[in-house]
Swiss-Prot record:
EC number: 3.1.4.46
Gene this chain is encoded by: GDPD2
Origin organism lineage: Eukaryota, Viridiplantae, Streptophyta, Embryophyta, Tracheophyta
Induction comment: By phosphate starvation.
Organism (species): Arabidopsis thaliana (Mouse-ear cress)
Keywords: Glycerol metabolism, Hydrolase
Bias (Pro residues) ranges: 332-342
Keyword Zinc annotated: no
Region (Disordered): 330-349
Sequence similarity: Belongs to the glycerophosphoryl diester phosphodiesterase family.
Tissue expression from the record: Expressed in roots, shoots, flowers and siliques.
Domain GP-PDE residue range list: 38-326
UniProt-recorded name of the protein: Glycerophosphodiester phosphodiesterase GDPD2
A GO term, aspect molecular function: glycerophosphodiester phosphodiesterase activity
Catalytic activity: a sn-glycero-3-phosphodiester + H2O = an alcohol + sn-glycerol 3-phosphate + H(+)
Alphabetical GO biological process terms: cellular response to hypoxia; glycerol metabolic process; lipid metabolic process
Amino acid sequence: MALRTVLVSDVPSLPDSVYGLSEGLELSKPTSFRLPGFSVIGHRGIGMNVLQSSDRRARGVKENSILSFNSAAKYPIDFIEFDVQVTKDDCPVIFHDDFIYSEENGIVNESRVTDLSLSEFLLYGPQKETEKIGKTLMRKSKEGKVLKWDVDLDDSLCTLQEAFEQVEQTLGFNIELKFDDQTVYEREFLVHILRSVLQVVSNYAKDRPVIFSSFQPDAAKLVRELQSTYPVFFLTDAGNEIHNDERRNSLEEAIQVCLEGGLQGIVSEVKGVFRNPAAISKIKESNLSLLTYGKLNNVGEAVYMQYVMGIDGVIVDFVEEIIESTTRMMIRPPPSSSPLPSPSKDDDVAITRPEFSQKEISFLLKLLSQLIQH
């Protein structure tokens, strides 16, 4: 992707507070970051919405909403993940899709989120002032069908500032910086957008743990150049989808992006890791953290396998179920009768990675690789 060169020194500086270290994050040097143990991270809060799904959990709480974030905060998780875009009047808002849809008099209207002002964006869906009626919020599925965005527990759209102000303070934010896959961005534009986000983070994050991530490799590198407080992860499909930008097509390319940009880690589609488990050791040798996302992360056994493999954390939709299943699988079995002193109660529930032989791990990985082909 060709970008016009702009010296970072020419970019207006952010407040000094942006450059301080945030408590709770082990960020000892530009390419070193570790999460506090194996982390379960709530996807778009308590889980993403799939409107056509027969599984009620996929239509439980409005994704990327304050209600969803605080619902996730009720569980013992370290972070939630959500998507941030910037409106045309420079306000960071939380919304996943590139386009937003509404219906009026039987006609479906489409708008690009970043072409809307903040006030226009907030007109969609339930309104904070209950006496007001917002535009009927619709969503376009991957199959191209436009559906009414119906969930059991709805909530209004929100800004990044509101999330910092209204979500449980101890819950970390994994902020995905959203950009259109089909657009080639000039460096100046990326800098402008990222500064809008960083300004809000600087003003409102306080001591909250924050991780930035992006599928856009130039944006990921730039946010690292513009601040040294918070870790930056590069998101990759790891070959599950092929993009024109080759940097997005493999874990090996993702490692290179991180090393070139001084990033702290990779967030990979989980099937890409299971297909290429050898990349895990390369990632660790490069002093990078590794998180995963994807549908398989809603299966407890697949999450546990990643824990065994040394992956640092998983982004999941079914937060309650995955927390319960992984806790059961990771709890040390009760001690047998023995004249030796009993371990403390805390030791009984200590999470320890089990020991598997290389042959056993290879067999499990081969089995997983075969399963995900179907």
